[in-house]
């Protein structure tokens, strides 16, 4: 709508989305980590709509499936930039963000308090809590999970490589 209330009908519009990784927590599970530290995700900008027109009431609906090829480490934040072009070429801009769940289920891990220097001793049992949730944060019971535990080796900062998760 224009500022005076009439519909902005039949104007050209375009929408782009910028995706970033976010550490969004689920309600009641704020102490759990739902991010995969092995997956790297760089900011990506996607064209969503280009050269589409608003209808007679000044609206435009769209549904877009984002193919991320299972590269997202967890929840994503999508920032949408919309532009609506006037007949003379000027445009109005709107920006809004939404959290996007790239997966139907998420597994979270809650680590116990570590010892000094954020370490766990290898000669004692350490219990981690796991939870499986739907994309809406509801418990997803009876899901089979495969869990692997890795011992991290300490390195000097200058000998760090991509094979080092710490």
Each model region followed by its residue ranges:
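A structural signal for beta-strand and strand-to-loop patches characteristic of beta-rich domains
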Residues: 1-166
């Amino acid at each position: 709508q224009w500022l005076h209330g009439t519909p902005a009908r039949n104007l050209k519009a375009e929408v782009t989305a910028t995706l970033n990784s976010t550490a969004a927590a689920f309600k009641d599970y704020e102490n759990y980590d739902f991010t995969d530290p092995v997956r790297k995700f760089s900011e990506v900008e996607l064209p969503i709509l280009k050269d589409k027109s608003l209808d007679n009431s000044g609206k435009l609906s769209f549904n877009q499936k984002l193919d991320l090829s299972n590269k997202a480490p967890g929840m994503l934040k999508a920032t949408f930039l919309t532009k609506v072009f006037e007949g003379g070429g000027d445009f109005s801009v709107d920006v809004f963000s939404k959290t996007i769940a790239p997966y139907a289920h998420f597994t979270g891990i809650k680590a116990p308090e570590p010892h000094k220097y954020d370490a766990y001793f290898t000669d004692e049992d350490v219990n981690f809590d796991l939870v499986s949730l739907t994309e809406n944060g509801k418990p997803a019971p009876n899901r089979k999970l495969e869990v692997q535990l890795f011992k991290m080796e300490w390195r000097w900062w200058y000998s760090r490589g991509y094979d080092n998760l710490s």
